[in-house]
Every structure is written in structure tokens, then in C-alpha cells.
């Protein structure tokens, strides 16, 4: 019996607790009407209460109004409270430049979220079935998806709705097929509404349901079971990955206003799968969801991680990812954050000592041989030819007319030009420390050493210089 199957599924998935009020999203179609009557019966057995919600999208003129009237009749017949609203999806679509399907979904979930918040509902129940799950997996495959998309619809979804809040969505009918809900309604003498737009092959989801799936079942009659099994396995794997990632995020990610920060060394240690998932969770925290965030955005961030400090990329919703000296930054207002403390005046460095500057400690030491040195140890460590660099060392920031001959270049260029070419943010440039000899710039700290003091096969002594941030 369907009611017993749904009851077992609800208990297994922990969808409802005694004392909860559940807001049922009822469109008037077979799936939502079946859900309404099954949940109404179970509410008495399991000790939860119900409230109905119906959004009239205004897309089918009088038919939409008849849908609303039918839901009103159902609520009255069962003695359940009903919240209704009529909206213009097409006006919203034009204003926000969305597809009709996207506009309807956004308005529907915003309405459900506001209604649930107004009445203190524990969750919103929607009537998605096994067939919806199969169609969703296929839709993700067609559009391009990783493992996350293969998991399809989940029994529980915590969804953040822009401008409306957070919504807990449950799907108690994911254990039933669409044909079963139709039979239930017929045997119960119910006459649910039929949406003729579901017969159109214009929307991609409809085309998959009406054309692609029937064809695939001629190739493999058990195709639907195969898809559902794949979705289950993908869901189990993603649940584990999300749990591990959440723990890492709590340990590694720091939030400062609208900017999330993580140490570069910690991020670089992570497996690529964890790295990508952590980025998704960071973006989800900032944006309240992952709408318009695609795999290519995540990959662009991953590729940018190997770039020098100051490199940045722009993301949807004016979100910015930027490489810092010791951190990766993701958020808004990053331009106002500078990793360099102010460095006023000039500081003379000793050799073989530690020197404390404004916000920095600089350690210098002489090494006997360049053999075996890791010259790419850190962007805040430089190895120089001691005899070429000399001992008359000064640290200061840029000055008007500074010239710099970067490693690998035959001629010097203006320091300003080098900073622009290397995409050093404008608000950083006046704070970047320079290591200066009596004649020239030896090192633009964090970026490039100069050509004149590079370590080569003739080097006898190596000067190691390390900058460390204080605090």
C-alpha cells in the first residue's frame, strides 16, 4: 500500500518529527494531490500537522485560476488551512532575464519560504517522484555534470532563497513512481488537474520525459532502475565528501566581513576533489546557494591558485577570488584588504641577523653553497648571490623613478610598469617591500628577484633572505 511505503520512507529518511507543521506545496496535479491525501492520513498517525500552499503562476489564464479553485476545494474538504498567492511569472521573467521555467521556480520557492517562515512550518513538502528524479539525473547529464549532478533529487534539501531566507524542503514521494500517484488518485475518486504544457516537447525536461527516456527503455528495459541505482551511489559518495569538506572548512577557513580566507599551504595539501568541494562550500556560504556557479568557475579558481600574489578573477555576482602571499581570498571588498602592513621609511639590514620592521621580521643568513637549495621555497624567501648583493642592504617601499631589472630580462624597466604588468593590485603597490643594495633593487618581495644578484654556477656564497609577517 502506498501510504505504508511513504510512511516507512519518511521514517527512514527522518523527514518529519511529531509536533512539526509541514507546509504542503499543492499545485493540483496528480503527484501533489496524492501527496496531500497520503500526508493527511499520516499526520494523524505520526502526530504532525499540515498547512497547504498554492502559488498561481498566471501562465495558463483561466486554467491557472481553476487550478487554484480546485486546491481551495481540497483544503476545505480536508479542513486544512491554505495560503494562496497569484503572481505574474512572465513579468518577473522579463525583469530578471530568466527562462520561464527558472522564473516560475524562483517565485514558487520564494513564496514557499516566506509562507513557511510566517507560520513557523518545520519544512515544505513537495511532490517529486521517482520519475522526477530520473528526469533530473538525465537533465544534468545532458547539460554536463559531475558526480554531484548524478545524485539527482535528495530526500531533504536545505535551500537558501535570495531575499526570503532558508528553507527545508522534503520529498516524501521519492519512493513512488508517477504512474502510482495517478492510480492512487483514480482509485480514491480524486480528479486532479492536468497541465497540458507537460505534453509540450519545448522544455528540455519534457523532451527527456517524452522522447529520450522511452527510447532508452527500448535499449535497456531496466534503464530507470540503473539510473536510480547510480543516483543513490552518487548521493552516498557526495554525502561523505560534503561531511569531510565541512569539517575542513570549519578548521581552515576564516571569515572577515564579506571575505573568506584560507592559508595557501593548507589548500595546496588538499586532494583536488576536496579542494573543489571546499570552494563550492565557500561560494555557497557567501552567495546563499550555487545558482549560476558552474564547473568552469571552480576550475578557473583552481588554475589561478598557482599564480603569483595579486592575481585575481571575477566571478558571478561580483564575487572575486584573489591570490594573496599566504592566503587565498574569496568574497567582496577584497580590494580593501591588503596583505602588506604599512612600511614607513628605510630599514638597514644586518647579515646573519633578524631585523624587525613595521609588521615584518626579516631574517638573513649566509649559506656556503647553492647546491641542493630549493630556490622556489616561498614567495617570501629569496636566494641571492652574496658577493653580488653586498652587505649594504636596505628595505623600503617604492619611490618615484624606481627602475627594476627582473630576473630573466636583459634591460631594466620602471618599477611601476612591472607592477602593472604583473597585476599587482593598485592598493598594494605602495606597501610592497623592496630589498635594495647600494645601487639597485635586488628583490621585489613576494614577486621577483633582480637579474643582477641571481644565483648561478659561479656563486660561492648564498644570501638567504626571508620576510615573515608579524601578528
From Swiss-Prot:
Tree of life domain: Bacteria
GO molecular function per UniProt: ATP binding; tRNA(Ile)-lysidine synthase activity
Keyword ATP-binding in annotation: yes
GO biological process: tRNA modification
Catalytic reactions of this protein: cytidine(34) in tRNA(Ile2) + L-lysine + ATP = lysidine(34) in tRNA(Ile2) + AMP + diphosphate + H(+)
Binding site for ATP: 27-32
Sorted UniProt keywords: ATP-binding, Cytoplasm, Ligase, Nucleotide-binding, tRNA processing
GO cellular component, one term: cytoplasm
Residue ranges crossing the lipid bilayer per the database entry: none
E.C. number: 6.3.4.19
Major subcellular site: cytoplasm
Cited CDD domains: TilS_N
Xref: SMART domains: TilS_C
Top-level class of the enzyme under EC nomenclature: ligase
Pfam families in UniProt: ATP_bind_3, TilS, TilS_C
Compartment(s) of residence: Cytoplasm
Family: Belongs to the tRNA(Ile)-lysidine synthase family.
NCBIfam families referenced in this protein's UniProt entry, alphabetically: lysidine_TilS_C, lysidine_TilS_N
Free-text note on domains in this protein's UniProt record: The N-terminal region contains the highly conserved SGGXDS motif, predicted to be a P-loop motif involved in ATP binding.
Record protein name field: tRNA(Ile)-lysidine synthase
Biological classification of the source: Bacteria, Bacillati, Chloroflexota, Dehalococcoidia, Dehalococcoidales
Gene name for this UniProt entry: tilS
Amino acid at each position: 500500500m502506498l501510504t505504508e511505503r511513504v510512511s516507512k520512507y519518511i521514517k527512514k529518511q527522518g523527514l518529519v518529527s511529531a509536533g512539526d507543521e509541514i507546509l504542503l506545496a499543492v499545485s493540483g496535479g496528480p503527484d501533489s494531490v496524492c501527496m496531500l491525501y497520503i500526508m493527511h492520513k499520516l499526520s494523524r498517525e505520526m502526530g504532525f500537522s499540515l498547512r497547504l500552499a498554492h502559488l498561481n503562476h498566471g501562465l495558463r489564464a483561466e486554467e491557472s485560476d481553476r487550478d487554484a479553485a480546485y486546491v481551495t476545494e481540497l483544503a476545505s474538504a480536508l479542513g486544512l488551512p491554505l495560503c494562496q498567492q497569484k503572481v505574474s511569472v512572465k513579468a518577473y521573467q522579463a525583469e530578471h532575464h530568466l527562462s520561464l521555467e527558472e522564473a516560475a521556480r524562483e517565485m514558487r520557492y520564494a513564496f514557499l519560504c516566506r509562507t513557511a517562515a510566517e507560520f513557523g512550518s518545520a519544512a515544505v513538502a513537495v511532490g517529486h517522484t521517482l520519475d522526477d528524479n530520473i528526469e533530473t539525473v538525465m537533465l544534468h547529464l545532458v547539460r554536463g555534470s559531475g558526480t554531484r549532478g548524478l545524485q539527482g533529487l535528495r530526500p531533504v534539501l536545505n535551500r537558501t532563497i535570495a531575499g526570503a531566507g532558508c528553507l527545508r524542503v522534503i520529498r516524501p514521494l521519492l519512493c513512488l513512481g508517477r504512474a502510482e500517484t495517478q492510480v492512487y488518485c483514480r482509485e480514491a475518486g480524486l480528479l486532479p488537474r492536468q497541465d497540458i504544457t507537460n505534453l509540450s516537447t519545448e522544455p528540455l525536461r519534457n523532451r527527456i520525459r517524452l522522447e529520450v527516456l522511452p527510447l532508452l527503455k527500448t535499449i535497456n528495459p531496466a534503464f530507470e532502475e540503473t539510473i536510480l541505482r547510480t543516483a543513490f551511489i552518487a548521493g552516498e559518495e557526495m554525502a561523505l565528501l560534503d561531511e569531510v569538506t565541512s569539517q575542513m572548512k570549519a578548521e581552515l577557513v576564516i571569515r572577515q566581513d564579506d571575505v573568506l580566507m584560507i592559508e595557501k599551504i593548507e589548500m595546496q595539501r588538499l586532494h583536488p576533489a576536496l579542494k573543489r568541494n571546499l570552494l563550492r562550500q565557500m561560494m555557497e556560504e557567501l552567495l546563499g546557494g550555487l545558482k549560476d556557479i558552474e564547473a568552469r568557475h571552480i576550475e578557473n579558481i583552481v588554475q589561478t591558485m598557482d599564480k603569483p600574489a595579486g592575481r585575481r578573477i571575477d566571478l558571478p555576482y561580483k564575487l572575486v577570488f584573489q591570490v594573496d602571499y599566504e592566503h587565498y581570498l574569496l568574497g567582496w571588498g577584497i580590494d580593501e584588504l591588503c596583505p602588506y602592513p604599512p612600511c614607513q621609511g628605510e630599514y638597514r639590514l644586518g647579515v646573519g641577523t633578524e631585523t624587525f620592521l613595521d609588521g615584518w621580521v626579516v631574517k638573513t643568513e649566509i649559506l656556503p653553497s647553492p647546491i641542493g637549495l630549493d630556490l622556489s621555497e616561498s614567495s617570501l624567501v629569496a636566494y641571492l648571490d652574496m658577493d653580488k648583493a653586498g652587505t649594504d642592504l636596505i628595505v623600503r617601499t617604492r619611490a618615484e623613478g624606481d627602475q627594476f631589472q627582473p630576473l630573466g630580462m636583459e634591460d631594466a624597466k620602471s618599477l611601476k610598469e612591472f607592477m602593472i604588468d604583473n597585476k599587482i593590485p593598485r592598493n598594494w603597490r605602495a606597501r610592497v617591500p623592496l630589498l635594495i643594495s647600494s645601487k639597485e633593487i635586488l628583490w621585489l618581495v613576494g614577486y621577483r628577484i633582480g637579474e643582477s644578484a641571481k644565483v648561478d654556477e659561479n656563486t660561492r656564497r648564498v644570501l638567504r633572505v626571508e620576510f615573515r609577517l608579524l601578528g
